[in-house]
Amino acid sequence: MVVGLDQLAALDLSLWMGSGAAAAGLLGVNQSTVSRQQRSALGLLGVSVVSSRGEVRLRGDVELLWAEREVHQMARLRGFAPLRIDANYASGPWFLGTVPEGWIAGRFALPGLQRPMGLLRERVLDAWVCSYQPDLPNADDPDWWVLDLLQAPLQVLASPQHPLAGERRLSQSDLERFPSLALPDGWFPSTEAHLRQQGLWRNAVEFHRYDPDDWEGRSHDGVTLLYGNSLTEALMPCTARLDWDLQLICGDALVVRRDLADQPAIQQLAAFLLARARAIAERFADVQPIH
C-alpha cells in the first residue's frame, strides 16, 4: 500500500461527492485536513486534479492509482475503513434512510448510469442502489452483479393543477399536447425508447447532480409531464398521477462489481436491502418485492 487509507479516501471521496467540503463532511474532519491528505495522495500517485463542468476529475497516469484502489477496497471489505454506498434520488431515501453498519452513504445525487457505474468500476464506490430497471446490466453480465429488490409500474406524473389531472380515459394525443421531460440521449435507452413510442420524453433536461428543481420542480409550471412510481410519488407530494398506463415496469436494484459479489460484506448488505425491500413493499399496493 503506497498511499494511506485516509489519504486516498480524501481524494476519492472528493471525486465521488464533487467537492472537498462534502468529502470532509462525510469523513467527519475539517476541509483543511481533506485538502492536505488529498495533496499528499496526488503527489505519491503522480496525478493531478482538474475541474470540469462542476465535477472533479484526475489527469495523468492512473495505473498506480487503480492498483492502490483495489488494495484499499479490499481493506474496506475487511473492515479497516468504512465501505461506500450511494443511491439515486428515488431509491436512497427508502433504502438508505438508515445506513447499514460499516458503511457511509452519499447524497443520492449522482446523475444517470454512466457516472455512478464509473465510480463502481474504478473502485471509488463499493455499492450503488438505483431505480433504473429496465436499463441496468443483464443478470449474466460478466462485469456486474445486479440484485433486483423491488418492482412497480411506471406512471405519468404532473402538477395537481395540470389540465389533465383528474381526467379519465386519456389518449396519447392528450399527452402530446404538453411538454414531457427527457434526460440526455442514451442515458436510459430502454426507457427512452418505450416512452418515445407513446409521445413522451421530448423536452431534454441536463444536470450534473440531482436537483429537484431540475426534475419534479419542472411540474410547477402546471403543464410539464414527468414520470415516477408509488415510491417517487410519496417523495414528491407536488405531483399527481395521470390516468395513463405506460405499460412499463420499473425496478430498484443493488449494483456491485461482479468480482465483489461473494464478499461477506456485500452479502450482508444484500440481506439488509432485501429486508428493506419487503418492508417498503408492504406500504404500497402496486410495489412488489422481487425476493
Predicted regions, residues:
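Short helices/loops that flank or line small-molecule/ion binding pockets
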Residues: 26-27, 113-128, 211-223
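Secondary-structure junction motif
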Residues: 95, 176-199, 285
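Flexible hinge/capping segments at coil-to-helix
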Residues: 147-154, 158-180
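Beta-alpha-beta core module
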Residues: 140-145, 152, 217-261
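A late-sequence structural motif
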Residues: 243-288
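N-terminal hydrophobic or amphipathic helices and topogenic motifs
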Residues: 1-111, 275-291
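Short beta-strand-centered segments that line the small-molecule binding cleft or hinge
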Residues: 114-154
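Hydrophobic hinge/microswitch elements
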Residues: 186-241
